[in-house]
């Protein structure tokens, strides 16, 4: 099994698709990496030669991937929260950040409903 950026990519899939299993590589970036490395995107991972795998590793080195990318995204959110801007406060309160309504909807961000006892009439 080929190991790229610390991830075992699936053997039976085409290289173009298998690279997307690495966090930070989507289909567009996968095609770019394969073009830079000069590897045919239609071959299966199990059919890659060792030199092809080395080329792919070299081509992925120039991108921020996996743990480094997750850390970078986390630090960006933490920075927003630390400076106290609106976006940071909304992240901290687990509310939608981009101006969506919250009186109804926003269930994914706010979590499941908290039942409130009704008033007596």
From Swiss-Prot:
The keyword Transmembrane does not apply. One of its GO terms (biological process) is translation. One of its GO terms (cellular component) is small ribosomal subunit. Pfam families: Ribosomal_S13. InterPro entries: Rbsml_uS13_C, Ribosomal_uS13, Ribosomal_uS13-like_H2TH, Ribosomal_uS13_bac-type, Ribosomal_uS13_CS. GO terms for molecular function: rRNA binding; structural constituent of ribosome; tRNA binding. Keywords: Ribonucleoprotein, Ribosomal protein, RNA-binding, rRNA-binding, tRNA-binding. Residues 100-121 have a biased composition (Basic residues). SUPFAM superfamilies: S13-like H2TH domain. It comes from the Bacteria. The keyword Membrane does not apply. Residues 91-121 are annotated as: Disordered. Belongs to the universal ribosomal protein uS13 family. NCBIfam families: uS13_bact. Part of the 30S ribosomal subunit. Forms a loose heterodimer with protein S19. Forms two bridges to the 50S subunit in the 70S ribosome. Located at the top of the head of the 30S subunit, it contacts several helices of the 16S rRNA. In the 70S ribosome it contacts the 23S rRNA (bridge B1a) and protein L5 of the 50S subunit (bridge B1b), connecting the 2 subunits; these bridges are implicated in subunit movement. Contacts the tRNAs in the A and P-sites. This is Small ribosomal subunit protein uS13. The gene is rpsM.
